Curated annotation (Swiss-Prot):
Organism for this UniProt entry: Listeria monocytogenes serovar 1/2a (strain ATCC BAA-679 / EGD-e)
Membrane topology: Multi-pass membrane protein
Cysteine pairings via disulfide bonds: none
InterPro entries recorded: UPF0756_TM
Name this protein carries in UniProt: UPF0756 membrane protein lmo1568
Family: Belongs to the UPF0756 family.
Subcellular location: Cell membrane
Predominant localisation class: membrane
Transmembrane annotation, as ranges: 6-26, 54-74, 80-100, 117-137
GO CC term, one of those recorded: plasma membrane
Keyword tags: Cell membrane, Membrane, Transmembrane, Transmembrane helix
HAMAP family attached to this UniProt entry: UPF0756
Length: 153
């Protein structure tokens, strides 16, 4: 029962409880339950491979709700381009989307960086009350940094 992976998960659960981070607590609890109920490795692989996309879909739905309810309309979109903050927001959205795309690919080909990114994200969630969207964006930043290193060589 107390394998290395279970101890690792319990450590993250403890960190989540200390930080009072419900997202981390729920995520770790779900994974622990999957392990305890001996959920098939195939299911775990599917969740690992598709989970980020499912999460992005849920976030996208949440972002679109104000449009569906009429809280945000075309006037708001047009007005957003009348301010520096609107243009900066547009640029930041584009940059983060590109970084996330590169990050997902990089995480798939370099498992070593994935471990560091996940640990860094958990630390940020616990210590700085960050949000666990970090690994994909961090991987994109790491990808761009590695491209720069390769270019310099």
């Amino acid at each position: 029962m107390f394998t290395e992976s279970m101890l690792f998960l319990l450590l993250f659960l403890l960190l989540g409880l200390i930080a009072k981070n419900n997202s981390l607590i729920i995520a770790v609890a779900v994974v622990i339950l999957l392990k305890l109920f001996h959920v098939d490795g195939k299911v775990m692989e599917i969740i690992q491979a598709k989970g980020i996309n499912w999460g992005v879909t849920i976030i996208t739905v949440a972002i679109l709700i104000p449009i569906a309810t009429g809280q945000i309309g075309f006037k708001d979109l047009i007005d957003s381009f009348k301010s520096a903050a609107g243009w900066i927001g547009l640029g930041a959205g584009i940059a983060v989307s590109i970084l996330a795309k590169k990050g997902v690919g990089y995480m798939a080909v370099d498992p070593q960086v994935t471990v560091s990114l996940v640990f860094g994200t958990i630390l940020a969630v616990v210590l700085f009350r960050g949000i666990a969207a970090g690994p994909v964006i961090a991987a994109g930043i790491a990808y761009m940094a590695m491209q720069l290193v390769a270019f310099i060589k």
